[in-house]
Amino acid sequence: MSQSYINVIGAGLAGSEAAYQIAKRGIPVKLYEMRGVKATPQHKTTHFAELVCSNSFRGDSLTNAVGLLKEELRRLDSIIMRAGEAHRVPAGGAMAVDREGYAKAVTAELENHPLIEIIREEVIDIPSDAITVIATGPLTSDSLAEKIHALNGGAGFYFYDAAAPIVDKSTINMDRVYLKSRYDKGEAAYLNCPMTKEEFMAFHEALTTAEEAPLNAFEKEKYFEGCMPIEVMAKRGIKTMLYGPMKPVGLEYPDDYKGPRDGDFKTPYAVVQLRQDNAAGSLYNIVGFQTHLKWGEQKRVFQMIPGLEHAEFVRYGVMHRNSYMDSPKLLTQGFQSRANHRLFFAGQMTGVEGYVESAASGLVAGINAARLFKEEEPLVFPNTTAIGSLPYYITHADSKHFQPMNVNFGIIKELDGPRIRDKKERYEAIAKRALADLAAYLTV
């Protein structure tokens, strides 16, 4: 291979992971990141692998598909997982991180790596004659997005993603909330804001009639179900919220709770959960409350939540457009372009949805870019593993109806033999098989 380095464009979760995996294999990397010279609508810092929505990497149990994926990534030496583990904050059975400490750790490791050259500039064209990993994310700049869309025949794929508000803990009315994790899993890590039926109905009415921030007239709303604005969810009906982000099951009142409740019920009618957002525990985000209501409306409506009557919002929810590719047509399971084998794509732009999934795609793309550099065959993880099932899904889905996908047990290959009826036991068996199958790939 005449090329002496590999380009990685974009230093989000996927690009950071790809750059690390390539450099780890002894290959020089030129890592391009435009933040620092050009801002995006959502990013707040110039740190690599910044988390722009939630600070949660979601469930950590092996009976949870994303928990399995995280364990696979740990075993494959993921820089994202390593930094996340070093900057964990309490989150019950989930893995949440101090977003600033975590991002600084990723940035420092990549900046100090002897084989990684950091180039702070905007890339406006796709290199055609060099091995390149494009991981510019769902917030890809317009100029580069046009080039990527050209690979897609100019098709306009987009959807809207929304970020939840963050409040100052010191302004929360602690007399109206209680500390508890659902079903008491792990340590009590969430502040729970319980609602009576009357409080919930008033809140639902206010939420469904609140004024939303305007969208561009030429853009059609197309939401990904996993990050749907709370006001859109509310308009689908009361049960959508009660079985969604405000479900009360497993969040019974503590014995010493003195706030209002419906009669002698031990469980609230509805619950809004607040999750710690930084290591200091001074900030909490409103779980599942991604929104694009106008800021004044957010304050008015969300201060109806018990405990948040006088809460100070350090960040209001915001809305942005996310773009993704027609991966079933464009990519191989190694995240390699079908049109140009020297190009690899990674991250949410490929149709994987979520922080952990983005890191996983970067790991696979980085490994395969390095293998191409060394003139080795592409690596395809088996779809009995979580890290193999994601690229399998996005490259085998129906192109006409392709939508971003979180990792889940439904996309992992089923177990051989009779179906295990107990769900927990079935997921444990899938996880055990996945980690056993992954073992053969730990030295690649």
Curated annotation (Swiss-Prot):
Cofactor list: FAD
InterPro entries reported in the protein's UniProt record: FAD/NAD-bd_sf (IPR036188), MnmG-rel (IPR002218), MnmG-rel_CS (IPR020595), MnmG_N (IPR040131), TrmFO (IPR004417)
Signal sequence, renumbered to the chain: none
Reactions catalysed according to its record: uridine(54) in tRNA + (6R)-5,10-methylene-5,6,7,8-tetrahydrofolate + NADH + H(+) = 5-methyluridine(54) in tRNA + (6S)-5,6,7,8-tetrahydrofolate + NAD(+); uridine(54) in tRNA + (6R)-5,10-methylene-5,6,7,8-tetrahydrofolate + NADPH + H(+) = 5-methyluridine(54) in tRNA + (6S)-5,6,7,8-tetrahydrofolate + NADP(+)
Keyword field: Cytoplasm, FAD, Flavoprotein, Methyltransferase, NAD, NADP, Transferase, tRNA processing
Example GO molecular function: tRNA (uracil(54)-C5)-methyltransferase activity, 5,10-methylenetetrahydrofolate-dependent
Coiled-coil residue spans: none
GO cellular component, one term: cytosol
Top enzyme category: transferase
Protein's cellular compartments: Cytoplasm
Any one GO BP annotation for this protein: tRNA methylation
Keyword Cell wall biogenesis/degradation belongs to the record: no
Pfam families noted in UniProt: GIDA
Residues the record lists as binding FAD: 10-15
HAMAP family to which the protein is assigned, alphabetical: TrmFO
Task of the protein: Catalyzes the folate-dependent formation of 5-methyl-uridine at position 54 (M-5-U54) in all tRNAs.
PANTHER family attached to this UniProt entry: GLUCOSE INHIBITED DIVISION PROTEIN A, METHYLENETETRAHYDROFOLATE--TRNA-(URACIL-5-)-METHYLTRANSFERASE TRMFO
Descriptive protein name: Methylenetetrahydrofolate--tRNA-(uracil-5-)-methyltransferase TrmFO
Organism of origin: Streptococcus equi subsp. equi (strain 4047)
Gene expressing this chain: trmFO
